[in-house]
Amino acid sequence: MSQSPIELKGSSFTLSVVHLYNSEPEVIRQALQEKVEQAPAFLKNAPVVINVATLNGDANWKELQQAVTAAGLRVVGISGCRDERQKRAIARAGLPLLNEGKGQKMATPEPAPAPAPVVDPNAPAKTRIISTPVRSGQQIYARNSDLIVTSSVSAGAELIADGNIHVYGMMRGRALAGASGDTQCQIFCTHLGAELVSIAGQYWLSDQIPSDFVGQAVRLSLLDNALTIQPLN
């Protein structure tokens, strides 16, 4: 008997979730484009889930999808929809509806970031230091610098740095070093349990991290444009 050409299996993936607080497509496009420009190596063409839990009233779902795509992201589904009329409208637009776990909490919106200062490319890079726990739903971004976290990083939290990332605590969230494309950046963890690790756009999900290194002190870097991992001595 010949083998079937396909096989369906269940799996899980770590995806970024875009929480919408406005239904105007152009407003959404501009806001997302700013985010993508901050970390192009990781976000450009990245798959995302759109959470619409806070949107009230009608929206043009096709135009919203086009706005997200125009910003450089790819919509894989819609979450947070509880209104049946809204669900039907989303389905008519050809967008998949995703069910969330019962215990899942919606991340609180981040305050609008202050305008970025002009960076002198010849100035020495500074280091951003976080000495408190990074909670689920939080995102920390170290622009043009290294990021050091001296506490734990919860699952669902995200660390992004244009430079290196150091975590001196339990690392359960996502760590994205070299976000602006610097392939020389590295990630250092004293206790690795990450959902995702990435350097200059090359990434591993949790199930791709070699099991011998989970829970250990490690250093991640790029070799021939591929992630490598070794003990941190």
From Swiss-Prot:
InterPro entries the record matches: CAP/MinC_C, MinC, MinC_C_sf, MinC_N, Septum_form_inhib_MinC_C
GO biological process terms held by the UniProt record: cell morphogenesis; division septum assembly; regulation of cell division; regulation of cell septum assembly
Keywords: Cell cycle, Cell division, Septation
UniProt superkingdom: Bacteria
Region (Disordered): 104-124
General function of this protein: Cell division inhibitor that blocks the formation of polar Z ring septums. Rapidly oscillates between the poles of the cell to destabilize FtsZ filaments that have formed before they mature into polar Z rings. Prevents FtsZ polymerization.
PANTHER family: SEPTUM SITE-DETERMINING PROTEIN MINC (PTHR34108:SF1)
Description of how the protein assembles with itself and partners: Interacts with MinD and FtsZ.
Assigned protein family: Belongs to the MinC family.
Stated name of the protein: Probable septum site-determining protein MinC
Gene, per the UniProt record: minC
